[in-house]
């Protein structure tokens, strides 16, 4: 059995005191309840940026994080983690905290890079990243390219733009824009 929770127009849906954008799908399973947040991709990206990086960081680092988060999410939408959801909300995937990690700066980073992803040879890059270069290497070294979030901040502080930052961490990848289809 399942239930969908929706709020009144423009309001948030809350669960355990945490507000979420979009709708919540509550699914009864043998071991308890599974709650899945369904929301627009760009709202998800803005929340991930704020959960993964301090919103006070340089705007270019936040934009690089937005592109990496969007690319990672889309790579996983192509091969979902389960039949009920694409990504978890922990750092195993990408940290996601609903509306609690949003700020004007994280929304602006998502908006400024709206629809931009990392692409390599026509595919979407599973843009791995971690807090710093040591963690990035330990967690993803054998997999290839991975962004250090602290490194991205340092590069942004030196004046590099988000595209230049991403090029440092994902060699050979290029920025591509998603086609927005009309339904």
Residue positions per predicted region:
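Conserved, single-site charged/polar hotspot
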Residues: 1-183
């Amino acid at each position: 059995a399942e239930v969908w929770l929706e709020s009144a127009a423009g309001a948030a849906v809350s669960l355990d005191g945490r507000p979420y954008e979009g709708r919540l799908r509550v699914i009864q399973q043998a071991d308890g309840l599974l709650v899945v947040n369904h929301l627009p991709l760009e709202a998800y990206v803005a929340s991930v940026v704020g959960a993964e990086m301090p919103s006070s960081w340089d705007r270019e680092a936040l934009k690089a994080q937005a592109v990496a988060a969007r690319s990672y999410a889309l790579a996983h939408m192509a091969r979902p983690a389960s039949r009920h959801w694409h990504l978890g909300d922990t750092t195993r995937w990408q940290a996601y905290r609903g509306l609690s990690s949003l700020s004007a700066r994280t929304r602006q980073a998502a908006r400024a890079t709206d629809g931009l992803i990392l692409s390599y040879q026509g595919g979407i890059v599973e843009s791995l990243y971690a807090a710093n270069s040591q963690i990035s290497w330990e967690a993803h070294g054998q997999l290839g390219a991975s962004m250090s979030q602290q490194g991205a901040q340092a590069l942004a502080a030196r004046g590099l733009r988000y595209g230049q930052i991403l090029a440092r961490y994902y060699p050979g990848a290029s920025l591509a824009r998603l086609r927005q289809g009309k339904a």
